[in-house]
């Protein structure tokens, strides 16, 4: 092949390879970005990206729910069955790794605009004063474009269609290893949205010494200078926006802040911690 033919052929080759890559990523859909039409393995997708995959799941199942938990990882500990009974509701848990309050605001708006929402339980965690509107990874922490007015459909679909094919390949490999019990690659319960704790709940705790030996993080918190909660004001602006949209649409909003270990407070300055909780109290009542 002479140089001229090679130059003319190169764009065609690139387009063919891009089409093959996009097709593979669409079929395997390791982040649940396209609704996982072929594998329907949302517990896996949500483990990779709960922000996108859970919205894809709700697009297909939203008629099964009328209430939602919203917040970062500690939100998963809220007992779905108890809240269902207490509020005569059908809850789905939209826990997201490292969710900041801007994520929560955008998703709350989407839920209320598109689905039936009777109750919204919002977990405002102390770390929400530390980060705000921060997409740390375009694949694993990306919102679904339908929940994010700042993201175009083109930007959303292109990032997942042209993603590294190793993500899709790994999904196929892990599918062959899948069992009835949760593993590290499928940690969510699809029907509730919460962490699937069937294995964790039967784990023998043993003595305090045994437990701390197995989970040394509880005795060895990171030793660093305290951090400032610089994003507290922005966080509270989003909480206020969520409260407002709930009031306007007759949604019962319950705000809580998940408890933390005493040693965890050492990560932050005392004045910042006080300001965070006092600022939240000025915006809304909370548990």
Q: Would you name each region that the model predicts?
A:
Residues 8-26:
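Hydrophobic membrane-insertion alpha-helices, especially the h-region
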Residues 234, 241-287:
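Extended hydrophobic/aromatic segments used for targeting, binding, or gating
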Residues 133, 137-249:
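Secreted/periplasmic serine-hydrolase-like ester/acetyl group-modifying domain
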Residues 27-51:
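Alpha-helical transmembrane signal-anchor/signal-peptide segments
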Residues 93-98, 225-232, 265-268:
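Second-shell loop/turn segments in exported
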Residues 1-7:
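Cytosolic-side transmembrane helix boundary signature
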Residues 43-69:
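Short extracytoplasmic
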Residues 64, 69-156:
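Membrane-embedded segments
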């Amino acid at each position: 092949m002479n140089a001229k033919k090679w130059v003319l052929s190169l764009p065609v080759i690139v387009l063919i390879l891009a089409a093959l890559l996009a097709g593979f990523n669409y079929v395997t859909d390791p982040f649940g970005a396209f609704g996982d039409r072929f594998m329907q393995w949302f517990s896996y997708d949500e483990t990779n990206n709960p922000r996108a995959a859970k919205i894809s799941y709700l697009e297909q199942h939203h008629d099964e729910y009328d209430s939602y938990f919203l917040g970062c990882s500690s939100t998963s500990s809220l007992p779905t069955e108890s809240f269902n009974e207490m509020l005569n509701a059908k809850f789905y848990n939209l826990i997201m790794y490292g969710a900041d309050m801007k994520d929560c605001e955008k998703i709350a708006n989407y839920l209320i605009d598109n689905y039936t929402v009777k109750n919204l339980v919002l977990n405002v965690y102390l770390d929400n004063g530390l980060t705000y509107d921060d997409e740390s990874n375009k694949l694993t922490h990306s919102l679904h474009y339908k929940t994010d007015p700042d993201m175009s459909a083109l930007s959303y679909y292109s990032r997942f269609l042209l993603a590294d094919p190793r993500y899709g390949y790994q999904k196929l490999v892990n599918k062959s290893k899948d069992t009835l019990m949760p593993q590290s690659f499928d940690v969510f319960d699809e029907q509730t949205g919460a962490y699937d704790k069937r294995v964790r709940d039967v784990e023998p705790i043993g003595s305090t010494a045994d437990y701390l030996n197995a989970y040394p993080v509880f005795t060895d918190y990171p030793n660093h200078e305290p951090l400032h909660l610089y994003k507290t004001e922005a966080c509270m602006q989003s909480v206020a926006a969520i409260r407002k949209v709930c009031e306007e649409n007759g949604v019962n909003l319950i705000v809580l802040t998940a408890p933390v270990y005493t040693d965890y407070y050492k990560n932050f300055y005392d004045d910042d911690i006080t300001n965070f909780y006092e600022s939240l109290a000025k915006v809304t009542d909370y548990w």
